[in-house]
């Protein structure tokens, strides 16, 4: 068996047992990258030299017994909106095409302390704005199951890299479904933790009240181990929460007897593909057969989530992206005689069309004549959505739903119709608006051989219940394969 067939936790155990080495694992991954990267475009930046150097140092620490954690020695890919000291960090945007941070994000630092080897930075929708990974300035990432299709977004490079075996696990960020939806499209596990669980320090912001960093992995066990490592209280992030229940691997228990699972009727109405509906409901049946109590219920306000989300996220983006002006770092337009001309040209040439669209939308909803009509109204809807979830979690331990209305669409199908792209987030964005944890894991394939994702949603700080439920389903489902050569 090749080390590429092992999960992250299995690989680390194999290294500690002397069956393989960190260097061998890194070289094996880079061989896979050389085989598949030209057709997939998962990475913006690769750092083979740095990875091999880290591998040597980490191997010595493992041999000396200094690194004993479940991820020690395991190669990881990092989404390109997470700062990595000395390694290009572009947000897949021309405007940051030459930006090399002088510091690393807290999540990356935590992984490095645990013995992770950074392979490189993964492709994404520009500034995490998109659902297909086609808005990248460095070209689209393609789905490893079928390269005519998108991998989802915005963490499409991370999801595709995990699914293709181009890394053992990856970090992504989730503002409205950007971990869970690509995980569903690529047939991997993706988790968005409760807001505040993982420090946002070093994450280049899109929507600060919605952004959260999380893992993409091959299975639930890896997901729990990664989340345990990256979760920490951080004084550098004022929204970081101090928790004493981050031993997430303790929730890897195959038992859902008596657990109450709610299925929101609102998520199974018009617009949901029949194959997706059938596979998700079949997964619910599996959990019911294992002893869970499964009931349908009404979760109101779902239809208002998309307009509320795109109002709030765009407003925050328009503010956050004001800092990219070509003055201190990033792309600067040439031949500008006046300062205002340099600002205008740098931003006009540096940002792509989707980013410009959201900046303009955000500026509009924050303008004096429309602030109350749009932005304040969206904040009220956000509060009502949180209240609706609170009422649901008074009755249920976990909510079970689809992750996306369809399987992965074809490349180019969403670019000409942004509304269609926005609607693909309909089942994920409410989780971000309410600050809740959610996990996506594969529950089958459609007739075209594309993965279907099951979404489980939990109450705030109840990641353990999600992990337990997901793990129990995964044990019944069996191992889900890596994507072989697409098409």
Model-derived features: positions:
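Structural helix-boundary/capping segments
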Residues: 35, 164-270, 281-293, 360-390, ...
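Short alpha-helical scaffolding segments that buttress acidic/His motifs in well-ordered protein cores
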Residues: 25-29, 308-309, 355-363
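Short glycine/serine-rich loop/turn segments
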Residues: 71-213, 264-266, 315, 401-419
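Short helix-loop capping/hinge segments that flank enzyme active sites or metal/cofactor-binding pockets
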Residues: 71-91, 250, 255-262, 315-386, ...
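Residue-level signal for inorganic ion chemistry
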Residues: 29, 51, 104, 223, ...
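Serine-dependent amide/ester hydrolase catalytic core
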Residues: 12-13, 269, 301-302, 325-433, ...
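An N-terminal boundary/leader segment
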Residues: 1-52, 289-290, 482-487
């Amino acid at each position: 068996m090749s080390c590429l067939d092992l999960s992250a936790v299995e690989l680390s155990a194999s290294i500690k047992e002397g069956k393989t080495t960190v260097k061998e694992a890194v070289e094996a991954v880079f061989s896979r990258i050389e085989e598949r990267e030209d057709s997939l475009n998962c990475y913006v930046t690769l750092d083979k030299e740095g990875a091999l150097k880290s591998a040597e140092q980490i191997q010595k620490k493992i041999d000396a017994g200094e690194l004993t954690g479940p991820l020690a020695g395991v190669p990881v890919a990092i989404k390109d909106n997470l700062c990595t000291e000395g390694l290009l960090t572009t947000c897949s945007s021309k405007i940051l095409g030459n930006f090399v941070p002088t510091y690393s994000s807290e999540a990356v630092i935590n992984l490095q302390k645990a013995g992770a080897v950074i392979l490189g930075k993964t492709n994404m929708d520009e500034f995490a704005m998109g659902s297909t990974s086609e808005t990248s300035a460095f070209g689209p990432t393609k789905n490893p199951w079928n390269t005519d299709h998108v991998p989802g977004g915005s963490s499409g490079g991370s999801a595709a890299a995990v699914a293709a075996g181009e890394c053992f696990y990856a970090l992504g960020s989730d503002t409205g479904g950007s971990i869970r939806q690509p995980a569903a499209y690529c047939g991997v596990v993706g988790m968005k933790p409760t807001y505040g669980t993982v420090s946002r320090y070093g994450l280049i912001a899109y929507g600060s009240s919605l952004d959260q960093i999380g893992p993409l992995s091959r299975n639930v066990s890896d997901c729990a181990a990664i989340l345990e490592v990256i979760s920490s209280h951080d004084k550098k992030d004022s929204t970081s929460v101090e928790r004493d229940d981050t031993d997430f691997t303790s929730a890897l228990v195959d038992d859902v007897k008596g657990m109450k699972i709610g299925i929101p009727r609102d998520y199974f109405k018009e617009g949901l593909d029949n194959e997706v509906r059938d596979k998700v409901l079949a997964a619910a049946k599996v959990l019911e057969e294992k002893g869970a109590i499964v009931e349908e219920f009404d979760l109101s306000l779902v239809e208002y989530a998309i307009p509320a989300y795109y109002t709030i996220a765009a407003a925050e983006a328009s503010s956050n992206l004001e800092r990219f002006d070509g003055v201190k770092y990033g792309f600067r337009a040439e031949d500008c005689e006046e300062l205002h001309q340099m600002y205008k040209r740098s931003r006009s040439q540096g940002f792509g069309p989707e980013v410009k669209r959201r900046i303009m939308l955000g500026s509009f909803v924050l303008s004096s004549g429309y602030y109350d009509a749009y932005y304040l109204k969206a904040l009220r809807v956000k509060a009502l959505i949180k209240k609706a979830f609170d009422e649901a979690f008074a009755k249920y331990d976990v909510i079970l739903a689809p992750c996306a209305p369809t399987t992965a669409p074809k490349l180019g199908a969403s670019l000409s119709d942004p509304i269609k792209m926005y609607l693909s987030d309909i089942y994920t964005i409410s989780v971000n608006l309410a600050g809740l944890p959610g996990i996506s894991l594969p529950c089958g394939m459609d007739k075209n051989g594309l993965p279907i994702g099951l979404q489980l949603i939990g109450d705030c700080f109840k990641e353990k219940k999600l992990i337990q439920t997901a793990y129990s389903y995964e044990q019944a489902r069996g191992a889900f394969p890596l994507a072989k050569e697409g098409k």
